[in-house]
């Protein structure tokens, strides 16, 4: 394969990746948008998101206590970092993301799972190897 066609293939793949990552956010929210009656906000959002990600990891062959083996940040630290990210996003005039999608609007369980980090082979194999 020539260099130019390789470059074109990589550029096309990158373009498709960027397009897919932006298409997952269906809404744009404003600061004064009210919360959806069935939306999850604040610590409820954090807890539910963490629960769904752990369930998805377990379903794909990981374990719920895999964080200790991979030296993942503690749940309290993740929660603080997540809440600070939500506050930073709220300062913007229009924002997208899990707070907009699942607090101001209603998210299905599958939409919550879409915000989970991908389960890698190393996370599944390291938990089963111990």
Swiss-Prot record:
GO terms for molecular function: hormone activity; toxin activity. The keyword Cell membrane does not apply. Expressed by the venom gland. The keyword RNA-binding does not apply. The modification 4-carboxyglutamate is found at residue 111. GO terms for cellular component: extracellular region. It is found in: Secreted. It comes from the Eukaryota. The modification 4-hydroxyproline is found at residue 34. Its main location: secreted. Keywords: Carbohydrate metabolism, Cleavage on pair of basic residues, Disulfide bond, Gamma-carboxyglutamic acid, Glucose metabolism, Hormone, Hydroxylation, Secreted, Signal, Toxin. GO terms for biological process: glucose metabolic process. Heterodimer of A and B chains; disulfide-linked. Belongs to the insulin family. This venom insulin, from a fish-hunting cone snail, facilitates prey capture by rapidly inducing hypoglycemic shock. Intraperitoneal injection of this peptide into zebrafish lowers blood glucose with the same potency than human insulin. In vivo, when applied to water, this peptide reduces overall locomotor activity of zebrafish larvae, observed as a significant decrease in the percentage of time spent swimming and movement frequency. Venom insulins constitute about 1/25 of the total venom of C.geographus. This is Con-Ins G2.
């Amino acid at each position: 394969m020539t260099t130019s066609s390789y470059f074109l293939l990589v550029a096309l793949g990158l373009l498709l990746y960027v397009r897919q990552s932006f298409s997952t956010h269906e809404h744009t929210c404003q600061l004064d948008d009210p919360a959806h009656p069935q939306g999850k906000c604040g610590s409820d959002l954090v807890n539910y998101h963490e629960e769904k990600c752990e369930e998805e990891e377990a379903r794909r062959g990981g374990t719920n206590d895999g964080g200790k083996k991979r030296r993942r940040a503690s749940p309290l630290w993740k929660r603080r970092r997540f809440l600070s990210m939500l506050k930073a996003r709220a300062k913007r005039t229009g924002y997208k993301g899990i707070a907009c999608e699942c607090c101001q609007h209603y998210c299905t369980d599958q939409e919550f799972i879409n915000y989970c980090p991908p389960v890698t082979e190393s996370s599944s194999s390291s938990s089963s190897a111990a």
